[in-house]
């Protein structure tokens, strides 16, 4: 790998070819330090849901209906009630309206199949069951086809406010509600098409960074107030207040600056960008795709 082809992700030099490897399946692997690693019952439950969701994804069956346990419901209630208090103060209007329209409450864990049916009627998006964090190409291929991958397992009960990996609380309370917005849905679909069409690893990284600072950690200006729409922020009781604190550098969303900015997913995000609207974000992505000459139009 020569200097010209070297790119940096998460502060490390990586081979750009790893960005465009063929689609693959997720793996069930709890990292060292995972709260549920030593809990045999939790691991067994994760294994069962992993196998079920993988089968439904590969066979195109849609999200399975899950009979959640009382412990999983307790964790959902504790985490979602804390988040809802913060959402009412800091989440974007579009997010809050969509959350209400989808009937998401802090009392019962919603069934993703039912939400998927509602989304299809609104924006032609649907939810794809994901057994775990999917590889780049698998994930982007799903959203290119108007499907958003979502997990259906719940984080470990010892840390209801924390998860080292995307779980249902992150996906359902972070990613799913904005899918009710047409501009947001079209934005996601275009990201998926562009990322799966290009064979240039640097371009894939550009689209990942664009997604990170919008879909995952995006802020939006609403009548002069900075509100949150990024899933990574909205699903974390720590990130919500931190994102609006004086410790974070917040500037208007400028695409060239965004795609040149690295990030570390293991740390609180101290660099964020603010958009004026989802329509603006969609236009910025369209211009980026054309500038990079990715043949998706």
Feature roles, as predicted:
Residues 153-283:
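A contiguous, surface-oriented mixed alpha/beta subdomain in the mid-to-C-terminal portion of proteins
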Residues 1-179, 258, 270-297:
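The feature captures two recurrent sequence modes
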